[in-house]
Amino acid sequence: MNQFRIVADSSCDLLTLDGADFVSVPLSIRTDTEEFCDDANLDVDAMVSTLRETKGRSYSACPNIADWESAFGESGNVIAFTITSALSGSYNAACVAKKNCEERNPARRICVVDSLSAGPEIALLIERALYELRSHADFDKVCEALNTYQAHTHLLFALESMHNLAQNGRVSKLAATMASVLGIRAIGQASAEGTLEMLGKCRGVRKARQFMLSEMVELGYKGGKVRIGHCQNAALALELCTEIQQRFPEADVRSYPLRGLCSYYAERGGIMLGFES
């Protein structure tokens, strides 16, 4: 294929992509007094610590249309990925930017993918996009193959804290406080509509790990790729990697620290797990 670029907002947790022209478009996390831009300069650990002490509201802000247009550049075909449109305006902004860029240069092709997810599931989609772009000369076939693949990717998450979700109104403050006091971990998934869907609650790391592994199999996991992002919880990420590889020796499993936006939602101790079915 001719010149191409892969673009994603920073919910993908990637800053670079080996062997590809890749651009990350930062979201930001804001409180009434501070703003954290989710780019290469962000100290994620410092942000997490600050937000834990924040008593007022906090929220995320998506890239604007101009940010997306700048990331798309002036030439070449583009595949772009956004955090789920159910949680952010990033997808809508990217679609307007696509329209503007294609009007300026009708020969260009830009495909904007609403991930209906975040973090590790987007990472899987980006990896697949790179594979398809290298394998096909036809842009439409790449987009079609990517759409087919997306139907077989999933995201699970385990939250040790729901402080930030309470501060931005996504869960009640009472529920977040009770979960913290009782040591309860909330387990959920990205639904087919791209919303946060709670699946259950567990007390203790072992039960949370077993719950996630059971859900993976229930959703059709048979040994495909797994990407695990963690917020200050490398130990649980490693335990998950080890157990998955013990059960599925051929599985391609990798773990890594989450960047800013996903750390904002996952919080300290949180895990986000993307996988293929």
Set out the residue ranges of the language-model regions:
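A glycine-rich beta-strand to alpha-helix segment
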Residues: T82, C111-V112
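Generic enzyme active-site microenvironment
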Residues: V7
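Class I S-adenosyl-L-methionine
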Residues: E34-E103
